[in-house]
């Protein structure tokens, strides 16, 4: 997104906006469109092709740190792999800080309602605990999160570990 720029606009939410997109592409003589992005962008790409009546061929390149696109097993998007690798390195550094300072740290990973990135970071670094929305349900109360974190801290203390990192 740095070179090509980014957009958070979703024209599929409005028939008028969708029509404007197709009209603009047609007026520019666009016959082939390559989209790069996540699930919203993939859906928008299919809608553009449909609304254009086959006059615009669309190719979508999956790129999302959420890793929530329905791709074949073991085929993550390149945005996810980059974020997971960097996130793992950051968590490893924080784990060393936690150990040397006898502290606990909480790390929050991006991903909206998908926990793939948090799980990848936590597993890759060997975090003390990793919480993901898929395991906690749709409505996550702060009390539930605090209870889980408290349990993990107490368990660590019982093993003589006065430090840890939760992702």
Model-identified regions with their sequence ranges:
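Glycine-rich nucleotide/cofactor/substrate-binding loop typically near the N-terminus or early
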Residues: 1-28
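Gly-rich Lys/Arg/Thr-decorated short loops/hinges at beta-loop-alpha junctions or inter-strand turns
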Residues: 1-8, 63-75, 100-102
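Residue-level detector of flexible, active-site-proximal loop/helix-junction positions
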Residues: 10-11, 65, 136-137
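Short glycine-rich, flexible loops that bind phosphorylated cofactors or substrates
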Residues: 12, 41-42
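Accessory alpha-helical/coil subdomains and C-terminal extensions
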Residues: 24, 32-37, 43-47, 51-59, ...
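An acidic- and aromatic-residue-enriched active-site/binding cleft used to recognize and process polar
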Residues: 38-39, 64
């Amino acid at each position: 997104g740095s070179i090509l720029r980014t957009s958070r606009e979703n024209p599929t939410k409005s028939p008028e906006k969708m029509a404007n997109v197709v009209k603009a592409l047609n007026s520019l003589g666009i016959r082939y469109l390559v989209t790069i992005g996540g699930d919203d962008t993939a859906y928008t790409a299919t809608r553009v092709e449909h609304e254009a009546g086959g006059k615009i061929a669309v190719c979508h390149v999956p790129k999302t740190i959420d890793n929530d696109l329905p791709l074949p097993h073991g085929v993550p998007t390149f945005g996810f792999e980059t974020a997971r690798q960097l996130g793992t390195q950051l968590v490893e550094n924080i784990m060393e800080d936690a150990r040397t300072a006898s502290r606990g740290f909480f790390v929050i990973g991006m991903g909206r309602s998908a926990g793939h990135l948090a799980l990848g970071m936590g597993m890759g670094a060997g975090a003390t605990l990793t919480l993901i929305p898929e395991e906690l349900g749709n409505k996550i109360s702060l009390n539930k999160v605090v209870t889980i974190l408290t349990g993990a801290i107490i368990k660590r203390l019982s093993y003589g570990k006065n430090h840890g990192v939760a992702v």
